[in-house]
């Protein structure tokens, strides 16, 4: 639209998770935790083959724990639309499918699940990281937690304002928030339904 025509095309996104002063891709001593971050990619794979979690546990001969990171759906959807160059309405449908599959996966699996809301993590990274380490049975060292916290953004990126939303899109998001328990935290955010786009 004309309102957003001046915005640059998003660059290919890359994130640097290197922790200052710590080993990246190397280890000293026994490995306690192996993890990966794939988000929608993991959901898509599990939607295609629900036995993958069991197969992974059988391969590594260790329990597989799930860390479910949730971001405000409006910001998620806007980012998805900008990265793919598609309309918000298309990504609303995609996001709804992801929620459907995540709900099914969480209902059907026996794995432990640790839930993190993106906004809480950014506002209190040290506390969330400490809680996660404790949940994973890892030692909690203040220097390590401080180093991990140092690479976290200072505030959430409210990317919802960078896309054009139609009334029906916002109504669909509100319906999803009401339906899915893991999105309920965002029910009180009135900007989902009414935001100044002038």
Question: Can you say where each PLM-predicted feature lies in the sequence?
Answer:
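Basic side chains
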Residues: 32, 37-38, 71, 115, ...
């Amino acid at each position: 639209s004309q309102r957003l025509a001046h915005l640059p095309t998003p660059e290919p996104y890359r994130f640097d998770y290197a922790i200052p002063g710590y080993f990246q891709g190397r280890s000293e001593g026994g490995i306690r935790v192996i993890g990966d971050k794939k988000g929608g990619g993991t959901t898509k794979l599990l939607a295609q083959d629900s036995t993958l979690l069991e197969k992974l546990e059988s391969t590594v001969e260790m329990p597989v724990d799930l860390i479910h990171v949730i971001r405000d759906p409006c910001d998620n959807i806007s980012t998805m639309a900008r990265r793919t160059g598609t309309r918000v309405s298309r990504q609303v449908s995609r996001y709804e499918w992801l929620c459907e599959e995540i709900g099914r996966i969480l209902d059907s699996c026996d794995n432990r699940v640790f839930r993190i809301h993106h906004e809480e993590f950014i506002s209190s990274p040290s506390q969330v990281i400490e809680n996660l380490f404790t949940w994973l049975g890892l030692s909690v060292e203040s220097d390590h937690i401080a180093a991990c916290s140092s690479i976290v953004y200072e505030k959430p990126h409210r990317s919802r304002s960078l896309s054009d939303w139609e009334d029906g899109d916002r109504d669909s998001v509100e319906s999803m928030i009401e339906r899915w328990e893991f999105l309920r935290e965002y029910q009180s955010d009135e900007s989902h339904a009414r935001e100044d786009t002038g």
